[in-house]
Amino acid sequence: MSAVIQERPEEISENELEQPDTSEMDGKYLTFWTDGQLFGVPIAHVVQIVGMQKVTEVPEFPYFAKGIINLRGAIIPVLDVRLRLGKQEAEYNERTCIIVTEISSSSVGFIVDEVDAVMAIDDNLISPPPKVSGGSDGYIVGVGKLESRVVLLMDTRKIVGAEEFEMLTGEIA
């Protein structure tokens, strides 16, 4: 896991995540750890971050969808990023978080091992992802270089395929 936690989920203010000016969010990423790898998603896609909570399983959901949560009256499907990446399932702990994002006007939560920080990454420090056969389905959209660290940048809208999205949310992507 991360040796230094720059910001914990409880330290990221709701104001920072509530529909700020999009120009202020350009080039900013919420970084998180999953299976010892550092990932990032555009902060513009993030609605909020919540601690791990009870997930209600739903029959016939895709293998990586853990189920649904009730978040202040809203029913939100949650996906385990580890499972989506084809990694082994891990036990959740006090650092496990759910990153709630908005995809096509529906909220979707992503379970991650640990939230790291909100980071600005200049476009000139982002390289295209390596070409891999099978696997990522295009959701790894770039590789950010930060000092001695590498951040795999993900597009939350591509983590879930169109058919899976419709099954999870009842909407067509």
Mark where each language-model region is.
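An acidic, low-aromatic, low-complexity terminal/linker signal
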Residues: M1-A173
